[in-house]
């Protein structure tokens, strides 16, 4: 997965992890029922004998698995992800289910580059529309997983599904969509309708809600601008999933309100001419294209 900014292709580099909680790995493993007090004593003795880390000694004694150690480390560093997780959460949410997957590492690279090149709270730049030229290029996948990796920084993150044509976030996160963005824009709900995601601290999802008969008109209302302004006050970052640019004007409207957009393309599928037209459409909507991402997943 590569992201191209207005200047160059983003290099691959790492991202910081949140600060540790101070809890010891042994205590976390015991709290989770992975080790007994007797097991912990055995591990400590082995640790002293070999000079290894606690987790390494526990694995060597076959008392825990690699996956259980990674889960404990994630809790120690306040790095939330799903192990068993809520029933029905899609496996597409790879950043939550498999946070050490190479694709997720690339998403963290993109997160880091966006933080360095785009994110600017003082200038009001904390809302990003995720769009593409055509359907099936991975907008919803990228939006959902970017939201997860931002929340893993320990900051409040909001994912809004503004794709009234084919909403998917309610299925990806398995959240109810009786109320959502359409409800808020029509005056039947508030931003507080956004649902916290169980197991992913700091992440909330505002699903599309009931599909309206007038998507573009609803997104053009001043209430959408007001909702985004309020969201920027309450959340560290706001990610918005949109319909494809090539089929509907909705994405231009959302990008205009967000002010910034990330364009998703798919390897071996998206044509250069379609990408160029999508960039023009976003520019015509007075949106800044912060980068173009090639989805290879």
Question: Whereabouts are the PLM-identified features?
Answer:
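P-loop NTP-binding module
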Residues: 1-50, 60-83, 87-297
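Short, charged amphipathic recognition helices of the HTH superfamily
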Residues: 53-54
């Amino acid at each position: 997965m590569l992201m191209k900014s207005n200047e160059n292709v983003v290099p691959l580099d790492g991202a910081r992890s949140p600060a540790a909680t101070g809890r010891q790995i042994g205590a976390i493993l015991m709290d989770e029922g992975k080790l007994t007090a007797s097991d912990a004593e055995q591990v400590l003795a082995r640790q002293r004998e070999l000079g290894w880390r606690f987790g390494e000694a526990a694995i060597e004694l076959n008392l825990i698995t690699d996956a259980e150690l990674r889960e404990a480390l994630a809790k120690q560093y306040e790095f939330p992800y799903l192990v068993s997780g809520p029933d029905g959460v899609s496996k597409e949410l790879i950043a939550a289910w498999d946070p050490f997957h190479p694709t997720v590492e690339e998403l963290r690279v993109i997160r880091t580059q966006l933080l360095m090149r785009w994110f600017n709270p003082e200038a009001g730049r904390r809302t990003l529309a995720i769009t593409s030229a055509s359907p099936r290029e991975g907008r919803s996948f990228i939006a959902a997983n970017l939201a997860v990796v931002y929340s893993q920084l320990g900051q409040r993150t909001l994912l809004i599904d503004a794709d009234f044509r084919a909403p998917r976030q309610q299925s990806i996160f398995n959240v109810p969509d009786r109320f959502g963005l359409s409800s808020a824009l029509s005056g039947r709900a508030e931003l507080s309708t956004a649902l916290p995601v169980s197991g992913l601290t700091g992440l909330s999802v505002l699903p599309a809600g009931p599909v309206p008969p007038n998507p573009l008109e609803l997104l053009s209302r001043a209430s959408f601008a007001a909702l985004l302004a309020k969201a920027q006050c309450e959340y560290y970052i706001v990610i918005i999933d949109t319909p494809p640019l090539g089929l509907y004007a909705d994405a231009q409207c959302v990008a205009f309100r967000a002010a910034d957009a990330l364009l998703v393309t798919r390897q071996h599928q998206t044509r250069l001419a379609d990408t160029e037209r999508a960039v023009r459409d976003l520019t015509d909507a007075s949106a800044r294209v912060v980068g173009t991402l090639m989805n290879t997943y």
